[in-house]
């Protein structure tokens, strides 16, 4: 993939309110298990996974697998474009749901 394609993929990943919400959520809470995000964001697993993959492929997220669980976080370090995009996203008026930690209580079903 050339530089233009990478840039366009990154930009297009931000054209969805759900993905903006996911970025704000992970920016606030840090590394989070998919099951906790699913419960906190009230989203079915397949829809959440699709959005997480788009953000990961666009270079915004990293995944850390622990056994059968997948934990996502904002990739660090981000390049200048992604850092500035995340800074702008922080100023958007988006209600960030409370983190529900099913993975810590053993209630995670994923």
Enumerate the predicted regions with their spans.
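Amphipathic alpha-helical dimerization/coiled-coil segments
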Residues: 2-6, 28, 76-110
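N-terminal helix-turn-helix DNA-binding core of bacterial DNA-binding proteins
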Residues: 5-46, 66, 70-78
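Short, hydrophobic-biased segments on the C-terminal half of alpha helices
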Residues: 52-53
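Glycine-centered, phosphate/nucleic-acid-interacting loop/turn motifs that mediate DNA/RNA or nucleotide
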Residues: 59
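Short beta-strand "wing" residues that participate in macromolecule-binding interfaces
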Residues: 63
């Amino acid at each position: 993939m050339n530089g233009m394609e990478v840039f366009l993929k990154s930009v297009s990943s931000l054209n969805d309110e759900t993905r903006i919400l996911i970025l704000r959520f992970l920016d606030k809470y840090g590394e989070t298990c998919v099951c906790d995000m699913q419960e906190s964001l009230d989203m079915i697993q397949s829809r959440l996974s699709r959005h997480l993959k788009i953000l990961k492929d666009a270079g915004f997220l990293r995944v850390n697998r622990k056994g059968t669980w997948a934990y996502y976080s904002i990739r660090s370090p981000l390049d200048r474009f992604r850092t500035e995009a995340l800074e702008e996203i922080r100023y958007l008026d988006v209600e960030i749901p409370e983190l529900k930690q099913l993975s810590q209580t053993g209630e995670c079903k994923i």
